[in-house]
């Protein structure tokens, strides 16, 4: 399985003759997490395109965007992940949300019933076999691949083809280090002040470890701890991720 999209535009363009049967254009506010049972790479772009074989396919997606909180500050909103099982052949589709999500109130309302629209270029909806919130498997961090496997087993869903072809740029799949994943986790829980302090510390110490900080913030302490447990390349990935969030 190969992922497609404008990952970081580091790969060479592939031949224009390499196309799949169904193309799905992902809206900039929608982030794919799992495609046909396999987790999407760490640096997938907001403006992604996925190519599928004809037939039954599956996506796990969520909304990822900056919104205004109740204090008038910008904060990152990651919605609950939704698993979409759909059937299509020889069509170009658009995946998006039919909701305006710009404030905390909008996000709260969307979370009550997160729903995504999948239409073709004529605006006609395509056959969605099933769409619902992906059940959480428990644990500190989400294991989306395992959750999808259990979901499909419970619902007797079999995806015949898990092959994706690349239509824009081909990139090596980036495996996320444990430290990078944990920094992501604690960063989402941190206050805006802690995020700013950690971002400054991470940038200053991108080639070394961050000295122990005397703070009363568990989130900041854990961010520093996991940053120090990560390789130099992983730290670069963390900094790049912070700059884009």
UniProtKB/Swiss-Prot annotation:
Its keywords, alphabetically, are: Signal
Annotated signal peptide: 1-20
* InterPro entries documented for this protein: UPF0319
| One Pfam family cited in the UniProt record for this chain | DUF2057
The family this protein is said to belong to: Belongs to the UPF0319 family.
PANTHER family, from UniProt?
A: UPF0319 PROTEIN YCCT
Q: What is this protein called?
A: UPF0319 protein VV0984
């Amino acid at each position: 399985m190969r992922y497609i999209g404008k990952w970081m535009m580091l790969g060479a363009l592939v031949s224009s003759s390499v196309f799949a049967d169904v193309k799905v254009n992902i809206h900039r506010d929608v982030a794919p997490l799992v495609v046909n049972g396999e987790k999407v790479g760490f640096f997938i772009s907001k403006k992604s395109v996925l190519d599928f074989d004809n037939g039954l396919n599956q996506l796990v997606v969520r909304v990822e965007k900056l919104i205004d909180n109740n204090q008038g500050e910008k904060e990152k909103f990651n919605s609950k992940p939704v698993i979409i099982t759909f059937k299509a052949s020889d069509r170009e589709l658009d995946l998006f949300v039919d909701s305006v999500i710009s404030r905390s109130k909008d996000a709260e309302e969307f979370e009550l019933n997160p729903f995504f629209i999948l239409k073709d270029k004529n605006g006609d909806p395509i056959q969605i076999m099933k769409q619902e919130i992906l059940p959480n498997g428990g644990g500190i961090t989400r294991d989306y691949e395992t959750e999808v496997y259990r979901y499909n087993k419970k619902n007797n869903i079999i995806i015949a083809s898990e092959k994706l072809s690349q239509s824009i740029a081909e990139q090596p799949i980036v495996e996320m280090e444990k430290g990078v994943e944990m920094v992501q986790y604690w960063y989402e829980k941190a206050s805006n002040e802690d995020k700013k302090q950690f971002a400054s510390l991470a940038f200053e110490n991108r080639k070394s470890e961050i000295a122990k900080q005397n703070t009363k913030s568990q989130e900041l302490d854990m961010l520093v701890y996991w940053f120090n447990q990560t390789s130099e390349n992983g730290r670069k990935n963390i900094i790049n991720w912070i700059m884009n969030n």
